[in-house]
A protein has these predicted regions:
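Short, well-structured hydrophobic secondary-structure segments
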Residues: 1-4
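Histidine-centered metal-chelating micro-motifs
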Residues: 26, 93-97
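Short coil/turn motifs at secondary-structure junctions
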Residues: 44-46, 97, 115-117
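A short coil-to-beta-strand element that immediately follows conserved catalytic motifs
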Residues: 6-16
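A short hydrophobic beta-strand segment most commonly corresponding to one strand
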Residues: 38-40, 104-117
Length: 117
């Protein structure tokens, strides 16, 4: 993943944590600018669980509106279908959030950050 993004050299894991979302729990928009690569591993989730959303790094521009909201090249934000056992890797400076968890079942993820070594 790091090679595809053009990051030379090695990376090392330097922090991780467990997220447990009960009904109505959420995580506001944020990023991990201090890291290079972040990861989310879905331990317990289902189709009705809260989604993780990612915001485009391209600044909004009124001169270039979204012509088709179903076009993945112009989305302002995007969520990936999540299943138990899914691992998502992304640039740490990408803004992301978790919407309010709508169900009584618990949603559990592991999150990781990696830096250059």
């Amino acid at each position: 993943f790091k090679d595809n993004l053009g990051f030379g050299g090695g990376v090392e894991h330097f922090e991780s944590w467990l997220n447990i979302y009960k009904k109505n729990y959420f995580q506001e928009w944020h990023n991990h600018n201090f890291a290079l690569i972040s990861a989310i591993y879905y331990l317990k989730t289902d189709k009705d669980s809260a989604k993780t959303w990612f915001k485009t790094p391209i600044p909004e521009n009124p001169n270039k509106p979204i012509f088709n909201e179903n076009n993945p090249y112009t989305w302002e934000k995007y969520s990936i279908d999540q299943e138990e056992g899914t691992l998502i890797l992304f640039r740490s400076d990408l803004n992301h959030c978790v919407e309010a968890h709508p169900t009584d079942s618990v949603r559990i993820t592991l999150a990781y950050n990696f830096k250059k070594n």
